[in-house]
Amino acid sequence: MYNLTNDTELEHTYMFKWFHRRKDNHSKHLSEFKERLVMQELASLDIEAIKQFALKDWELGETHGLPHWQRVERNGIILATSEVNITVVRLFAYLHDKCRIDNGCDIEHGKKAAIMINGIRHTLLKGLTDNEFELLSKACELHTTTLRTGNSTIDTCFDADRLDLERVGIIPYPNKMATSKGEYYAKNLSE
């Protein structure tokens, strides 16, 4: 039995209970998805090259940088269902904030990212099909302005990003999530 002497210790105890419960509840989904991920290659795409491209000239630090992108990728993997194109979700994770000019309000960065990826369509993204490229472009363009699209891949991209809003002090509202799995995780973030 723990002797909790202050609110901080109590808070940490609840945090770890939530973490362990969440991990236990979703290990089936994770193992199922990891199996799919191993089976689905990134075609001729080199995710490390995409990461390096995203990091090139990055000046805004970690709030919207690599640690955030890695969490978005992880969230997307957890949220993905069989109809989601995981290649698009993983690319979105590293490219959606590439064109941010500040860590505050930058509503146009999604549109700028969509324009930017057109510039790498025939180099870093040459392995994408036209459909995958269109999904990636729309996900980047709309991720700050659109609640949901009805497309499972794009909506998974949105929720993967939204589930990391706590890093900037914003708790994602379950009813503002684009997918049912995103809604579930948003409801259970505080447990």
Q: What role is predicted for each listed range?
A:
Residues T87-K98, K112, M116:
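A short glycine/small-residue-enriched secondary-structure motif
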Residues V72-G76, E108-T123:
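An active-site-proximal "capping" alpha-helix that borders the catalytic cofactor pocket
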Residues L4-L45, L55-V84, L95, C105, ...:
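Divalent metal-dependent phosphate-bond-processing catalytic cores, especially two-metal-ion Mg2+/Mn2+ enzymes
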Residues R100-E108:
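Catalytic Zn2+-binding segment of zinc metalloproteases
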Residues V84-L91, L124-T144, S152-T153:
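Acidic/histidine metal-binding catalytic segments
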